[in-house]
């Protein structure tokens, strides 16, 4: 007697009988990009299992599991076997459920998978560099289990417009007053001009508008740079010709312009001018060894920190150490790179470390103005993140990574050597490596953030993070940060990554 279940579905059978045999779960998803499914994976599985998108249209899987063998056996490769072709998907539904639902790995595999390919389903793209060779647990469990958590963190980190305007208004009053008074008084800094830099002006500030960076730039014509011990980043500054009456001659140590002397006088003038400000509660913070900034503390009533950085502006060619830096040709374009390198470069009084002390005559190259341009024009498409263009999650990943490091530093003094510039440098390299806007789709925020974590962990493991503008200057060298600190940070990031970022719950 013909099975009545087969008669009810006979009019819809058009699939070839070659699709009958059930298959094992496909591993094509293991090779998918972390920012979206791989398009080829579905079509290859369809050749063996039938089009999985048709499964919901088939009759409900009412066949008892005990009937699976009987139905498969009854089905014959015949042109009239229409009913058998439609009944068979019900036999395979339990297997397909494990394949199609990435949220149920425990159903498919109660133990950690022995096949290394299978693990890639939850940890990101297989071709990325990262902490894969560290022996640490691999799966970005936080990103996988709580995809909305990162978005909630970003919402809390978003600055309120009211707070921004109030803080910016107060800072601008203080900075403009200092700038005017310095330009009016007869001193070596009469020609200074303002240049806004830092995370606030790059629109990547997090939590609260309580930190600002402002450059007071001073043009110095016809200077000659002497690289300090082949660092590529630190230089001795000399004048090719010192005009008679040049006020900067007061800061010379022989032929070399002393960064320490110049910063000391700059600091003295700012302290004098701050004392004249009566309507705002502002003071000058104690000097920090090796810091190029004069830090102001404004109470508004909340405390606002303002770093005023003296910078020498040179309109000459960029130093030879930067020739291979700024590798944006395949991302923002060769023309943009050429134009950026035609802009002036800057030197700040950040001294090179010499053992346990600092070399007081040295200056360090600064590219804050170029970094600001990149962050505000980060898309391969000119309209990226504009009101009329598609959005990306580049800056969101940067904010999350900055916040993660910031919170870890608050808890562990072993991380004092690390700073947000390390995060910024790492993500510049990631944007260069993955230049397409589609690779930073906001819908894939968790996997994009995990890519950044993996890259940063690999930099810590290999102790190598090249300066984005000066490739031979390694920001993670043993001379700058000891190995123990890098291993400590790596373990803390791995813990957060594999446990759903519990540190974010403290926000």
Swiss-Prot record:
GO molecular function, one term: chromatin binding
Modified residues (5-glutamyl polyglutamate): 272
Biased composition regions of type Basic and acidic residues, renumbered to the chain: 44-57
Result when mutating residue 244 to E: Slightly decreased tethering to chromatin. Does not affect interaction with nucleosomes
Annotated gene: Cgas
Domain notes: The N-terminal disordered part (1-146) binds unspecifically dsDNA and expand the binding and moving range of CGAS on dsDNA. The disordered and positively charged residues enhance CGAS-DNA phase separation by increasing the valencies of DNA-binding. The N-terminus is required to sense chromatin and its phosphorylation blocks its activation by chromatin DNA. When the N-terminal part (1-146) is missing the protein bound to dsDNA homodimerizes.
One Gene Ontology cellular component annotation held by this UniProt entry: plasma membrane
Result after altering residue 217 to R: Reduced sumoylation
Domain of life: Eukaryota
Positions where Phosphoserine occurs in the chain: 199, 291, 420
Chain sites annotated for binding Mg(2+): 211, 213, 307
Post-translational modification: The N-terminal disordered part (1-146) is phosphorylated by AURKB during the G2-M transition, blocking CGAS liquid phase separation and preventing activation. Phosphorylation at Tyr-201 by BLK promotes cytosolic retention. Localizes into the nucleus following dephosphorylation at Tyr-201. Phosphorylation at Ser-420 activates the nucleotidyltransferase activity. Dephosphorylation at Ser-420 by PPP6C impairs its ability to bind GTP, thereby inactivating it. Phosphorylation at Thr-52 and Ser-199 by PRKDC inhibits its cyclic GMP-AMP synthase activity by impairing homodimerization and activation.
Protein name, as recorded: Cyclic GMP-AMP synthase
Cellular localisation: Nucleus; Chromosome; Cell membrane; Cytoplasm, Cytosol
Entry binding sites for ATP: 199, 371, 402, 420-424
Modification type Phosphotyrosine: residues: 201
Covalent crosslink: Glycyl lysine isopeptide (Lys-Gly) (interchain with G-Cter in ubiquitin): 271, 335, 372, 399, 402, 409-410, 464
Cofactor notes: Binds 1 Mg(2+) per subunit. Is also active with Mn(2+). Mn(2+)-activated enzyme forms an inverted pppGp(2'-5')A intermediate, suggesting a non-canonical but accelerated 2',3'-cGAMP cyclization without substrate flip-over. Mn(2+) ions are coordinated by triphosphate moiety of the inverted substrate, independent of the catalytic triad residues. Undergoes a liquid-like phase transition after binding to DNA, which is dependent on zinc.
Site entry: Cleavage: 307-308
Regulation: The enzyme activity is strongly increased by double-stranded DNA (dsDNA), but not by single-stranded DNA or RNA. DNA-binding induces the formation of liquid-like droplets in which CGAS is activated. Liquid-like droplets also create a selective environment that restricts entry of negative regulators, such as TREX1 or BANF1/BAF, allowing sensing of DNA. A number of mechanisms exist to restrict its activity toward self-DNA.
In-chain residues carrying the UniProt-annotated modification N6-methyllysine: 491
Motif Nuclear localization signal boundaries: 281-291
Region (Interaction with collided ribosomes): 329-370
Modified residues (PolyADP-ribosyl glutamic acid): 176
């Amino acid at each position: 007697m013909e099975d009545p279940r087969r008669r009810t579905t006979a009019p819809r059978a058009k699939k070839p009988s070659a699709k009958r045999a059930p298959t094992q779960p496909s591993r094509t998803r293991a090779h998918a990009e972390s920012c979206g499914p791989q398009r080829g994976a579905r079509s290859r599985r369809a050749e063996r299992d039938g089009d999985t998108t048709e499964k919901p249209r088939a009759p409900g899987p009412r066949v008892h599991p005990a009937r699976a063998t009987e139905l498969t056996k009854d089905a014959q490769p015949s042109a009239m076997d229409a009913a058998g072709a439609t009944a068979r998907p019900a036999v395979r539904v339990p297997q397909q459920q494990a394949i199609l639902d990435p949220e149920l790995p425990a159903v498919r595999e109660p133990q950690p998978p022995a096949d290394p390919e299978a693990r890639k389903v939850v940890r990101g793209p297989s071709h990325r560099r990262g902490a894969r060779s560290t022996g640490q647990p691999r799966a970005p469990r936080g990103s996988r289990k709580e995809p909305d958590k990162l978005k909630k963190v970003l919402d809390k980190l978003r600055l309120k417009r009211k707070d921004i305007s109030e803080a910016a208004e107060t800072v601008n009053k203080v900075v403009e007053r200092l700038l005017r008074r310095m330009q009016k008084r007869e001193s070596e800094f009469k020609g200074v001009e303002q240049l806004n830099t830092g995370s606030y002006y790059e629109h990547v500030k997090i939590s609260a508008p309580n930190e600002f960076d402002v450059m007071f730039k001073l043009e110095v014509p016809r200077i000659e740079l002497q690289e300090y011990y082949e660092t590529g980043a630190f230089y001795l500054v000399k004048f090719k010709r010192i005009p008679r009456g040049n006020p900067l001659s007061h800061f010379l140590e022989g032929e070399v312009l002393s960064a320490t002397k110049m910063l000391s006088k700059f600091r003295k003038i700012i302290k004098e001018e701050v004392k004249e400000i009566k309507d705002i509660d502002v003071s000058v913070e104690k000097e920090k060894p090796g810091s190029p900034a004069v830090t102001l503390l404004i109470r508004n009533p909340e405390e606002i920190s303002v770093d005023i950085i003296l910078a020498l502006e040179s309109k000459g060619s960029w130093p030879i150490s930067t020739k291979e830096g700024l590798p944006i040709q395949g991302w923002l374009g060769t023309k943009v790179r050429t134009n950026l390198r035609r802009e002036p470069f800057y030197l700040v009084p950040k001294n090179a470390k010499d053992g346990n002390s600092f070399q007081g005559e040295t200056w360090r190259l600064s590219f804050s103005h170029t970094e600001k341009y990149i962050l505000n024009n980060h898309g391969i498409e000119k309209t990226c993140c504009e009101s009329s263009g598609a959005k990306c999650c580049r800056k969101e990943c940067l904010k999350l990574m900055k916040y993660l490091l910031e919170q870890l530093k608050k808890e562990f003094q072993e991380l004092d050597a690390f700073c947000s510039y390390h995060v910024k440098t790492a993500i510049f390299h990631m944007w260069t490596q993955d230049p397409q806007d589609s690779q930073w789709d906001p819908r894939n925020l968790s996997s994009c953030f995990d890519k950044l974590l993996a890259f940063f962990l690999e930099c810590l493991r290999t102790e190598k993070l090249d300066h984005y503008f000066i490739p031979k200057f390694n920001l993670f060298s043993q001379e700058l940060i000891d190995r123990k600190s890098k291993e400590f940070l790596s373990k803390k990031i791995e813990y957060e990554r594999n446990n759903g970022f519990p540190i974010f719950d403290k926000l």
